[in-house]
Amino acid sequence: YDTLIFAAGILGSYTYMLCGGIFCNAQTGNIVLLGIALGTRSWTSALYYVIPISAYALGAFISELIPDDVKHRFHIRWETILVAVEIVFGALPASTPVQVFQVSINFIASMQYNTFRNSEGVPMATTFATNHVRQLGIGLAKELHRRHGDTSHRRVIKRHFSMVLFFLAGTILGAVACIFLGRRAVWVAVLPYAIVFAAFLHADLTSEKEWLERDPAGH
């Protein structure tokens, strides 16, 4: 999960810096910008923000419909197939139109968020950091008021803190890559996705082969 949110951080920097100032990891920012455009009667700008929002909604829609059919056809879990799809989109040629990157990255970010929902029983978001920051605050409050000897919440604090750090590291790397590589910076996200895909595929074919029928929620 750290690797997934690291890759999402790279894509977040890429779409904001090189794809017209849009946010791919979550849609709150895009909806705010849409509202501003509508309020200022900037109709063309409003339409510009409708596109990534619609792509994000479509990603969630698709990720709810097709996992069962796909995993039975290929005999590996939907999570593994999704990461393979993310690699394909991440490896698009640098000459690909910006609009295609906008739609595709928002689309796969939505599917990733909707698919990878928890890690070892801890609810997780693998495309943005807001929930992890909130959970850190909750965890620190529990630490302040914890009962003597009860440290069960500390594991959760560590997981969320790790996710925030990896997301931040991804955005930093993404920003640096955008400066030096330009449109080719998106390829940097392929490596962490490839690592995750290799681990997932190996698990599907060996130690977690019997987990095929489990609902998508992450490995």
Predicted regions and their residues:
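Alpha-helical transmembrane segments of multi-pass membrane proteins
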Residues: 1-219
